[in-house]
């Protein structure tokens, strides 16, 4: 009986397997090999060049892994110690402290762009840390006017008038029944 060949499975290419072109050579080699069942049929399968190339790459990878002493899946292998960077070459920043040997020409990692430089000028306020609330309020109003916002000049009461008041006894829209009675559609 012939074995069924899966059409998605790539058959292995053996380097010792010869592709025979002449049928006369086929019969002489079959006679020289071990006796076979008379029902078996020899399959002359020629793999595609892509399959041959893939098989060669697999063989080279197997030979390389045997040479290096790493046999098995690369996922299960641990990294080699010579692949790890030396501790002296690693730059580890201190937590919250700037490096003393940092040159002044280095740029910061994050640069914030602002429209004007005087947005948060702390020199206006007193050095004691306590400044009058009026001064802060004036500064905020000036900044809001600069930015184009007039939030403090428009009262909020007008927006509250748009919300309708809730009734004490809500009624059904379809039959005007109150919440205590059952709604009946007429």
From Swiss-Prot:
InterPro entries: FAM219. Residues 1-47, 59-132 are annotated as: Disordered. Residues 67-81 have a biased composition (Polar residues). Pfam families: FAM219A (PF15260). Residues 123-132 have a biased composition (Low complexity). It comes from the Eukaryota. Belongs to the FAM219 family. This is Protein FAM219A. It comes from Danio rerio (Zebrafish).
